[in-house]
Swiss-Prot record:
<dbReference type="Pfam" id="PF02151">
    <property type="entry name" value="UVR"/>
</dbReference>
<feature type="region of interest" description="Disordered">
    <location>
        <begin position="603"/>
        <end position="649"/>
    </location>
</feature>
<comment type="similarity">
    <text>Belongs to the UvrC family.</text>
</comment>
<keyword id="KW-0742">SOS response</keyword>
<dbReference type="InterPro" id="IPR010994">
    <property type="entry name" value="RuvA_2-like"/>
</dbReference>
<dbReference type="InterPro" id="IPR001943">
    <property type="entry name" value="UVR_dom"/>
</dbReference>
<dbReference type="GO" id="GO:0009432">
    <property type="term" value="P:SOS response"/>
</dbReference>
<dbReference type="InterPro" id="IPR001162">
    <property type="entry name" value="UvrC_RNase_H_dom"/>
</dbReference>
<dbReference type="GO" id="GO:0006289">
    <property type="term" value="P:nucleotide-excision repair"/>
</dbReference>
<dbReference type="InterPro" id="IPR050066">
    <property type="entry name" value="UvrABC_protein_C"/>
</dbReference>
<dbReference type="InterPro" id="IPR038476">
    <property type="entry name" value="UvrC_RNase_H_dom_sf"/>
</dbReference>
<dbReference type="Pfam" id="PF14520">
    <property type="entry name" value="HHH_5"/>
</dbReference>
<dbReference type="Pfam" id="PF22920">
    <property type="entry name" value="UvrC_RNaseH"/>
</dbReference>
<dbReference type="GO" id="GO:0005737">
    <property type="term" value="C:cytoplasm"/>
</dbReference>
<dbReference type="Pfam" id="PF01541">
    <property type="entry name" value="GIY-YIG"/>
</dbReference>
<dbReference type="GO" id="GO:0009380">
    <property type="term" value="C:excinuclease repair complex"/>
</dbReference>
<dbReference type="Pfam" id="PF08459">
    <property type="entry name" value="UvrC_RNaseH_dom"/>
</dbReference>
Length: 649
C-alpha cells in the first residue's frame, strides 16, 4: 500500500512514477505534471470508491520516480518505460496492423497512383490512411473510372507498343502511346489529387473551365471527355457521406465495462469517413487516464497523425500530448472535446461504434465459452481450454524439415503467438524425433511464456506419446494433451475416392479414439486448429525450400549480395536464363561489374575464365583477335549454350 511516508520527499515537478510490487516488479507506470500531488492521490487514506483502483494500490510495495524538465519529456519517458517493463496495469498496445496510403509523385512524368505502407519524406503526395489493402484497392478502382491514369510503372508503360487493356475499358488514357498530351494528363493527375483530398468543388471548377475552354476552341472531343469526367465525379460525390465540414481528423469513442475498455477510431479525410478501427484492452484505472495512455501509445506506433484529434472526454495535460504529436507530424496538431455541431455528432458515432464492438465481442465470447465447455466435456478436460496450441512437422524425406506452432485463444487464432521452428538436431526422416525437438524447444526456451491449457498434435497415438514423454521429462504440469489423426481416404485404381474414414481424436490413457460426431462443433474446432498448423508449417517449408533451391547457385559468389542476386533474377527472369547468359550479357545487367560477372560465370560453369587482355591488345597479345582460322578457339569466351563451357571436374 502507498503511504504518506513513501511520498514525503517526492518533488512537485513533472516526471514519471513507477509503482512496484513486493518482488520489485513494476506493475504500473504513470506521468504527472506534479509528481507529489499525483502519487498522493493513491495514498492509503484515499477514499476512492473504485474497487479496481483500491485493489491495485494494495499491491504496491514501493514507488520510484524520475524527474523531467517538461510534461512532454514525461510523456516520452512514460511511453519508453511502459515498453521496457510491460507493467500489468498499463495498456500494452502492440498493434501489428499496417495502414495503407495512396502515393502520387507529381514530379514524375505522367504521375501514377500506387498503394504503399510507409510514408517517407520524399516530396510525393500521400492520401489516406486506409485500414486495409482491400479498401485502398477499392478506392483506386473507383478513381480510375473518373481519372484514367496509368496503371503500370513508368518503364513498363513507356515500353509498350500499343495501349493496354485498361485503355480499352476507358480506365487508362494511354500516355504510353501518345493518346493524351502531357498537359491534359497533368490536369487528370491534379484532379485525382484534389478529389482524394475531398476538394470536390475545386475539381468540378477545374474541369468545368477546361470543358468550356475546349468548347470555345472547337476541341469537341476534349470537351466531351471533361463533360464525362464531371458527370462521373458528381455521381460519386452524391454517394459519399460528408460527415464533417472539411479537413482531416481522427475521432475516438470510448465504451467502458468494468476493467475492460473498448475504443473505436474513425478516420475522417477531406470531410469524408474513409475507415475505422476498434481496440480492446484491460484497464483498471480512470477512463480519462486510459484514453490519454492509449493516444500516446497509438500514435507512437507510426500511425498517421491528422491535424485534429477529437475525443469524447477531457484528458490530463493535453497540451503536452499536442506538442509531442505536432513534433512527430511536422505540423500543428490539436486535441479537442467537441461540445456541439457535426464534430460532436462524429464523436457520438464513434462512441456508438465502440459500444457495438463491445456487444459483438461479448456475443462471441459467450459463443466461444459454450464451445470450449462442450470440448472440455467431450475430451474429459478439467476445465475449458482457453489457450490451445497445435504443432505440426513438414519435410521431404527428412530434408529441409521445419515445425510450426499455432495458438488459439478463446477459440480464435492469435497470429502474434505463432512460432516457426527449423529442425536442427534430426538428420534422418523421423517425424517423432522432430516433434520431440520442437516440443522440447518450446518448453525450454519459452518457459517464461504462458502455458497452454491443451496441446494438440497432428497425429495419432505415436505423436501423442512423444508429447506426453516431453511433458513428463520437462516436468510440465497442468497441460492437457490430445492427438488428432487425419481421416484416411481409400481410392480405386482410377484414383476415385471410394471411402473416407473419420477424423479421430486420441487422449492419453486410451487405446481407442474418442467418439465424436464428425459435424460436431468441438471436432470442427480441433480440425480447424490442426489444419491451420499444417498450413503454417507447409508455408514455412516452401519458403525454406525455395531459398535453398533458388539461392544456392548464386549465394557465395564474390561481389554478388542479396541486392545483385535479386536484380539478376529480375533482369533475366529466372535462374535458368542467368545460367545461359554470356559474360557480356551478365556485365550489362543492372548494377553488375565485370569482376562480379566473371566470378559468377566461373561459379556456374565450374572453371576459371581467361584473364581479359590488356587495353589495346587482343587475346593473342599482339593486337589480333583470336579466331577459328588461327586455331586458338580455346582462348575465346565460351558460348552460353553449353557447347564450349569448361567442364566441371
Amino acid at each position: 500500500m502507498i503511504t504518506q511516508a513513501m511520498i514525503e520527499n517526492f518533488p512537485s515537478s513533472p516526471g514519471v512514477y513507477l509503482m512496484k510490487s513486493a518482488d520489485d516488479t513494476v506493475i504500473y507506470v504513470g506521468k504527472a505534471r506534479n509528481l507529489k500531488k499525483r502519487v498522493r492521490s493513491y495514498a492509503g487514506d484515499t477514499r476512492d470508491s473504485r474497487i479496481h483502483i483500491r485493489f491495485m494500490v494494495q499491491l504496491v510495495h514501493s514507488v520510484d520516480y524520475l524527474v523531467t524538465d517538461t510534461e512532454k519529456e514525461a510523456l516520452i519517458l512514460e511511453n519508453t518505460l511502459i515498453k521496457q517493463h510491460r507493467p500489468k496495469y498499463n495498456i500494452n498496445l502492440r498493434d501489428d496492423k499496417t495502414y495503407f496510403s495512396l502515393r502520387m509523385d507529381m514530379k514524375e512524368q505522367f504521375p501514377r497512383l500506387s498503394i504503399v505502407r510507409k510514408i517517407p519524406s520524399d516530396g510525393a503526395r500521400y492520401f489516406g490512411p486506409y485500414a486495409s489493402a482491400t479498401a485502398a484497392k477499392e478506392v483506386l478502382k473507383q478513381l480510375y473510372k473518373m481519372f484514367p491514369l496509368r496503371h503500370y510503372p513508368l518503364a513498363t508503360c513507356m515500353a509498350r507498343k500499343r495501349p493496354c487493356l485498361y485503355h480499352q475499358i476507358k480506365q487508362c488514357s494511354a500516355p504510353c502511346c501518345g493518346l493524351i498530351s502531357a498537359a491534359e494528363y497533368a490536369a487528370l493527375a491534379q484532379g485525382a489529387a484534389l478529389f482524394l483530398e475531398g476538394k470536390n468543388n475545386e475539381v468540378a471548377r477545374l474541369y468545368r473551365s477546361k470543358m468550356n475552354l475546349a468548347s470555345e476552341q472547337m476541341r469537341y472531343e476534349d470537351a466531351a471527355r471533361y463533360r464525362d469526367l464531371l458527370r462521373a465525379i458528381e455521381v460519386t460525390v452524391e454517394r459519399q457521406k460528408m460527415v464533417a465540414q472539411s479537413g482531416d481528423s481522427d475521432v475516438f469513442g470510448v465504451h467502458r465495462e468494468a476493467d475492460r475498455m473498448q475504443i473505436a477510431l474513425l478516420h475522417i479525410r477531406g470531410g469524408t469517413l474513409t475507415g475505422g478501427r476498434s481496440f480492446l484492452f484491460d484497464w483498471e484505472l480512470e477512463t480519462e487516464e486510459g484514453l490519454a495512455s492509449f493516444l500516446n501509445e497509438y500514435y507512437d506506433l507510426d500511425a498517421p497523425i491528422p491535424p485534429q484529434v477529437l475525443i469524447p472526454l477531457p484528458i490530463a495535460e493535453p497540451a503536452a500530448l499536442e506538442e509531442l504529436l505536432s513534433e512527430k507530424a511536422g505540423k500543428k496538431v490539436t486535441i479537442a472535446v467537441p461540445q456541439r455541431g457535426p464534430k460532436l455528432e462524429m464523436v457520438k458515432l464513434a462512441g456508438k461504434n465502440a459500444e457495438t464492438a463491445a456487444q459483438e465481442r461479448l456475443a462471441r465470447e459467450s459463443s466461444s465459452a459454450t464451445l470450449l465447455t462442450e470440448l472440455a466435456e467431450k475430451l474429459n478436460l478439467p476445465h475449458p481450454p482457453r489457450r490451445i496450441e497445435c504443432y505440426d512437422i513438414s519435410n521431404i524425406q527428412g530434408e529441409m524439415a521445419v515445425g510450426s506452432r499455432v495458438v488459439f485463444i478463446d477459440g480464435r487464432a492469435d497470429k502474434s503467438l505463432y512460432r516457426r521452428y527449423r529442425i536442427k538436431g534430426v538428420l534422418q526422416s523421423d517425424d517423432f524425433a522432430m516433434m520431440r525437438e520442437v516440443l522440447s524447444r518450446r518448453f525450454k526456451a519459452d518457459s517464461h511464456e504462458e502455458k497452454p491449457d491443451l496441446i494438440v498434435v497432428d497425429g495419432g497415438l505415436g505423436q501423442l506419446g512423444v508429447l506426453n514423454a516431453v511433458l513428463d521429462e520437462l516436468e510440465v504440469t497442468g497441460v492437457e494433451a490430445a492427438g488428432l489423426a487425419k481421416s484416411r481416404v481409400a481410392r480405386d485404381m482410377e484414383s476415385e475416392e471410394i471411402e473416407r474414414s473419420d477424423e479421430r481424436v486420441f487422449r492419453p490413457g486410451r487405446k481407442n479414439a474418442i467418439a465424436l460426431r464428425q459435424s460436431s462443433a468441438p471436432l470442427l474446432l480441433l480440425v480447424r486448429i490442426r489444419d491451420e498448423a499444417h498450413r503454417f508449417a507447409v508455408t514455412y517449408h516452401k519458403d525454406v525450400r525455395s531459398k535453398v533451391l533458388t539461392g544456392s547457385e548464386l549465394d557465395g559468389v564474390a561481389g554478388i549480395g542479396e541486392k545483385r542476386k535479386k536484380a539478376l533474377l529480375k533482369h533475366f527472369g529466372s535462374l535458368k536464363r542467368v545460367k545461359e547468359a554470356t559474360l557480356e550479357e551478365l556485365k550489362g545487367a543492372p548494377g553488375m561489374t565485370e569482376s562480379a560477372a566473371r566470378a559468377l560465370v566461373e561459379r556456374l560453369h565450374g572453371g576459371p575464365l581467361p584473364n581479359p587482355p590488356p587495353p589495346g591488345e587482343g587475346a593473342m597479345g599482339d593486337g589480333s583477335i583470336p579466331s577459328p582460322r588461327n586455331g586458338v578457339m580455346d582462348d575465346s569466351i565460351p558460348s552460353p549454350s553449353g557447347r564450349g563451357w569448361p567442364k566441371a571436374g
